[in-house]
């Protein structure tokens, strides 16, 4: 079937289903007959376009069924019975279903998700039969316990839980007029909230009823039993809803008792046009049951519709630079009129002045009931679900300006108004889209637990984050939906602000990497990065090339430190697979360390860099290696280097010795990866940007084959430290020496450090120096040890004479001398100040500095 024919066939079927609902809600025999004939005619038109034999048989049967029913309505004395729908006449939605076999742990996660706010919501299995709602003679109506919680202001006007007939009798002034509750009504509805703070829920209900009224929905949303397709209430007062939350569709059972009020204010959603319309209040009660009670402050309508319908939620931040009216309109207009997307919208925080001038409510959700375009002008019909709303925003002029547009209603309900698309983008903050999952053919779900008490990573570091491989052979559109499972909100008397703080202070996001399904360590280099949202869901839309595997990372900010369950769902036009991301490296070692006052040496330009924590890495076979430095203090910028140093401590930084490093200093985590590292002993140095920055860190050493990693002791470990006086080389003098005495045979290391270099009063860089250890002086002196292989050096970390042995009693041979010789500065004008640190097994003595000519 061609695409235009398929679209037309769907339109005829949708109109036929709307006519079916009109039959059940008809108030006269003539209305019912006309609607039945209308249903038959639309099924006939759809049949003429059908090309699949199975569809032809089904549509032919529906056409004959409604011709027969029209005849019965016309001839029967009890036309209401003939007009009444049966549950089987309303088709179940054909949703994509995940076929992946769940693990035992995933099944446990779904069972854990059934317990919520003191109730049990089991996963949906099969549709309930009519026997479940029967009520025998003399049997009391079904009563669900315990009663839902009310807030303190609500309890002040609360007048008890009452059945719909009691509520309607109370609100009916004429005692001779009996108003009966119904589950469907003909024509338009006008749903509003009053005392409840659930604007997001009521806006969601307005969006779904509007879609039904436009005939753009092929099934009742949300799904309710026993009244799908019937206007008659449940005989027993029991209702079962099919809601999607905590990883699957679940069964939500309620009774029909609603909270009544002592005043004219209502404690539940009402239809101002049809006060006896029971369906909205029951949907609201069922939803509030799983969200903790009637004191629910509201979330956002995208989340609410996700639960009510199972339609895929997407949040669009209207003030983002990349969101334009043209792009948004083109994306939504056709889908909206095909019934494939529900639209709601929310304001941000507005001042009282802005609320007065704009006629909008701060941090409030609205429903979008219609979209239209005429003469280049794009408008949306917006409804405020609050009962006290004005007709329209005060100064946008949209009402008077839209009268010349086609199909404009002759009148508006209070709180309903047309608004230009560009003004809507300007005055509202968030647009919530809920997409019909039937637009996708394939789905795959993964359920998992994130232990945030022990497995929380630092910002920008993903080593502890849940990661998954998402692959597709054919490529195409793939949508990834991350859902955080609802948890019990707390004690019944919890403060409202505490409830909201728990809901709004935590954020989740999705990152996507082109990493072939292998785990990644840092957030850098993401192919796609989703925004951090305070909703329990976030959507990532992808276009995947054929034969591609992406790595998907779940990220969070400020979630409570406990076990949190999630579901990650992939929706696709082609088969898609999800699995846990594989570790790139087979062997992983985790080492704890810290920067202390004695080991916080700063970056490689600091003279104290060699004091930083260092580790020996020993490798016996060629291997790829990854070094990840993770620091929980996100104020510290960190860095990691890998040196060729034969496994010894690094005392000076030379570019020829650096094998790899992590690049710029980075907050949170630093990563260096080296492929095909040859066997040998190497040294790892972990540093912060500045000296004296203290903190803990974790070093993750990963490799393809086993390797050995061990901390290197500090340079002064097991040694006595002696520091000389400051020696000064004034201009024109380039050599000085000091005596060195040892009490017994000892091993010693010497380090010369510059303390100041000036020309006049202006600081300059130190002069390159050479340090030697000499036996005696004069023509017969003997050089025992030298620094830097006999070359002059101005290394910021100091000039070193590595370990050598000295014995006492050499005074008769001229004594032992530490000699510092420099290459003079420009014109011989530099004054250099140096000190020498001796690290020896025994305490040594360094004499006063003596100046000599070079």
Swiss-Prot record:
The active site is at residues 199, 364, 384. Its EC number is 3.4.22.-. SMART domains: calpain_III (SM00720), CysPc (SM00230), MIT (SM00745). InterPro entries: Calpain_cysteine_protease, Calpain_III, Calpain_III_sf, MIT_dom, MIT_dom_sf, PalB/RIM13_Calpain-like, Papain-like_cys_pep_sf, Peptidase_C2_calpain_cat. GO terms for biological process: proteolysis. Residues 118-437 form the Calpain catalytic domain. It is an enzyme of class 3 (hydrolase). The keyword Thylakoid does not apply. One of its GO terms (molecular function) is calcium-dependent cysteine-type endopeptidase activity. Keywords: Hydrolase, Protease, Thiol protease. Residues 2-83 form the MIT domain. Belongs to the peptidase C2 family. PalB/RIM13 subfamily. PANTHER family: CALPAIN-7 (PTHR46143:SF1). Required for the proteolytic cleavage of the transcription factor pacC in response to alkaline ambient pH. Probably is the signaling protease that mediates the first proteolytic cleavage within the signaling protease box of pacC. This is Calpain-like protease palB/RIM13. It comes from Aspergillus oryzae (strain ATCC 42149 / RIB 40).
């Amino acid at each position: 079937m061609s695409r235009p024919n398929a679209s037309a066939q769907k339109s005829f079927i949708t109109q036929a289903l709307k006519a079916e609902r009109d039959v059940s809600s008809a108030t006269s025999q003539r209305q019912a007959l006309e609607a039945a004939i209308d249903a038959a005619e639309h099924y006939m038109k759809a049949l003429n376009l059908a090309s699949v034999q199975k569809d032809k048989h089904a549509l032919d049967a529906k056409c004959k069924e409604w011709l027969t029913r029209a005849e019965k309505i016309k001839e029967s004395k009890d036309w209401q019975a003939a007009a009444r729908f049966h549950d089987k006449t309303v088709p179940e939605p054909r949703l994509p279903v995940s076929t992946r076999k769940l693990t035992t742990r995933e099944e446990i996660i779904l069972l854990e998700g059934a317990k919520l706010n003191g109730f049990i919501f089991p996963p949906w299995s099969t549709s309930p039969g009519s026997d479940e709602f029967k009520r025998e003679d003399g049997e009391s109506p079904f009563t669900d316990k315990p009663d839902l919680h009310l807030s303190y202001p609500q309890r002040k006007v609360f007048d008890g839980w009452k059945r719909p007939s009691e509520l309607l009798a109370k609100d009916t002034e004429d005692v001779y007029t009996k108003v009966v509750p119904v589950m469907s009504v003909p024509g338009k509805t006008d749903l509003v909230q009053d005392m409840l703070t659930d604007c997001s829920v009521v806006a969601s209900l307005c969006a779904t009823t509007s879609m039904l009224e436009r005939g753009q929905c092929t099934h009742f949303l949300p799904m309710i039993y026993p009244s799908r397709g019937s206007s008659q209430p449940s005989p027993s007062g029991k209702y079962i809803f099919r809601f999607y939350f905590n990883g699957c569709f679940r069964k939500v059972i309620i009774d029909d008792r609603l909270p009544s009020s002592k005043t004219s204010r209502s404690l539940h959603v009402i239809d101002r046009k049809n006060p006896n319309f029971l369906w909205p209040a029951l949907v609201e009660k069922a939803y509030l049951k799983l969200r903790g009670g009637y004191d629910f402050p509201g979330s956002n309508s995208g989340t609410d519709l996700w639960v009510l319908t199972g339609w895929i939620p997407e949040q669009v931040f209207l003030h983002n630079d990349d969101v334009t009216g043209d792009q948004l309109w083109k994306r939504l207009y056709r889908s909206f009129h095909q019934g494939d997307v529900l639209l709601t919208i929310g304001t941000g925080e507005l001042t009282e002045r802005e609320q007065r001038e704009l006629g909008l409510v701060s941090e409030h959700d609205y429903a979008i009931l219609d979209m239209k375009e005429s003469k280049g002008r794009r408008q949306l019909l917006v409804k405020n679900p609050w009962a006290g709303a004005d007709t329209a925003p005060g100064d946008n002029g949209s009402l008077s300006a839209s009268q010349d547009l086609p199909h404009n209603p002759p009148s508006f309900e209070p709180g309903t108004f047309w608004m230009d698309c560009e003004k809507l983008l300007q005055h509202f903050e968030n647009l919530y889209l809920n997409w019909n999952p039937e637009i996708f053919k394939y789905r795959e779900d993964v359920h998992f637990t994130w232990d945030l008490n022990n497995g929380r990573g630092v910002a920008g570091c993903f080593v502890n984050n849940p990661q998954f491989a998402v692959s597709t052979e054919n490529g195409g559109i793939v949508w990834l939906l991350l859902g955080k499972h609802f948890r019990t909100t707390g004690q019944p008397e919890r403060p409202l602000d505490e409830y909201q703080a728990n809901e709004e202070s935590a954020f989740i996001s999705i990152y996507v990497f082109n990493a072939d399904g292998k785990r990644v360590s840092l957030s850098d280099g993401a192919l796609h990065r989703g925004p951090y949202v305070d909703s329990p869901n976030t959507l990532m839309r992808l276009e995947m090339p054929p034969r591609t595997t992406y790595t998907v990372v779940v990220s969070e900010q400020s979630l409570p430190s406990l076990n949190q369950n999630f579901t990650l769902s992939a929706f696709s036009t082609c088969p898609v697979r999800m699995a846990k991301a594989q570790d790139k490296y087979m062997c992983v070692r985790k080492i704890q360390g810290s920067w202390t006052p004695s080991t916080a040496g700063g970056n490689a330009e600091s003279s104290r860099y060699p004091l930083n924590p260092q580790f020996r890495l020993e490798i016996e076979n060629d291997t790829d290696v990854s070094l990840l430095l993770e620091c929980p203090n996100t104020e510290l910028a960190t860095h990691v280097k890998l040196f060729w140093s034969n496994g010894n401590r690094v005392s000076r930084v030379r570019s020829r010795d650096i094998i790899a490093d992590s690049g710029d200093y980075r907050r949170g985590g630093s990563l260096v990866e080296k492929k095909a590292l040859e066997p040998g002993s190497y040294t790892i140095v972990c540093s912060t940007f500045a000296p004296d920055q203290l903190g803990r860190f974790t070093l993750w050493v990963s490799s393809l084959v086993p390797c050995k990693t061990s901390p290197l002791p500090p340079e002064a470990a097991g040694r006595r430290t002696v520091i000389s006086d400051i020696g000064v080389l004034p201009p024109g003098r380039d050599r000085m020496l000091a005596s060195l005495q040892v009490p017994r045979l000892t091993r010693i290391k010497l380090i010369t450090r510059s303390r100041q270099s000036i020309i006049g009063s202006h600081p300059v860089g130190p002069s390159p120096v050479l340090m030697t250890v000499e036996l005696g002086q004069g023509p017969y002196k003997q050089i025992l040890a030298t620094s830097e292989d006999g070359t002059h050096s101005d290394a910021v970390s100091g000039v070193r004479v590595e370990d050598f042995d000295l014995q006492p009693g050499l005074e008769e041979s001229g004594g032992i001398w530490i000699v510092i010789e420099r290459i003079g500065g420009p014109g011989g004008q530099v004054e250099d100040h140096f000190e020498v640190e001796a690290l020896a097994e025994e305490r040594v003595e360094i004499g006063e500095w003596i100046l000599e000519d070079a």
